[in-house]
């Protein structure tokens, strides 16, 4: 598992392809995902050592700042992030269900990581801006008391209040 992941979300497809190329050349990172999302945005998800991921994201964010919607770097992503992104998560049972919807992909992944780290919940799915006019959503499950706790932490997190 990578020690860090980072994302750049671009407003245009052409910028996304150029940014992905710059990111791969700037540092020793693995491109996990580089694809078009709705409505014509482009998302690049990279993994690697923290310093490499940060350098890679910074290069794209700096060079294409007028076309970058959002970015993030997570130094120690929760292990449940990837199964939720790739649709392979299999929670043992579903008790209470939590759903969070965002307008950008980066904020959703940061929110999912925070939710998984601050409450005893299982991420079910992270739907990343496909088929929803650019919106993203996540579903998670946990006890009737744990799911609201995760959302309390999300509401308090400064970068997620938009």
Task: Give residue spans per PLM region.
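Short amphipathic alpha-helix segments
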Residues: 14-26, 107-120
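Short glycine-/aliphatic-rich beta-strand segments at the starts of folded cytosolic domains
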Residues: 2-10, 92-102
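The feature marks the first
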Residues: 2-40, 44-47, 51
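A common structural junction motif
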Residues: 27-28, 61-68, 119-120, 155
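Conserved small/polar residues in nucleotide/adenosyl-binding loops
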Residues: 152-159
């Amino acid at each position: 598992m990578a020690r860090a992941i980072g994302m750049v979300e671009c407003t245009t497809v052409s910028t996304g392809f150029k940014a992905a190329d710059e990111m791969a050349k700037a540092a020793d990172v693995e491109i996990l995902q580089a694809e078009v999302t709705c409505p014509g945005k482009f998302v690049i998800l990279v993994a690697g050592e923290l310093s490499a991921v940060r350098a890679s994201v910074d290069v794209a964010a700096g060079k294409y700042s007028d076309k970058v919607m959002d970015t993030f770097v997570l130094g120690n992503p929760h292990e449940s992030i990837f199964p939720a992104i790739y649709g392979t998560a299999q929670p043992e049972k579903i008790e209470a269900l939590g759903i969070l919807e965002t307008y950008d992909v980066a904020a959703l992944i940061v929110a999912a990581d925070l939710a998984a780290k601050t409450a005893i919940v299982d991420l079910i799915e992270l739907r990343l801006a496909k088929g929803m006019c650019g919106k993203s959503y996540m579903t998670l499950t946990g006890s009737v008391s744990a799911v609201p706790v995760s959302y309390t932490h999300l509401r308090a997190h400064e970068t997620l209040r938009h």
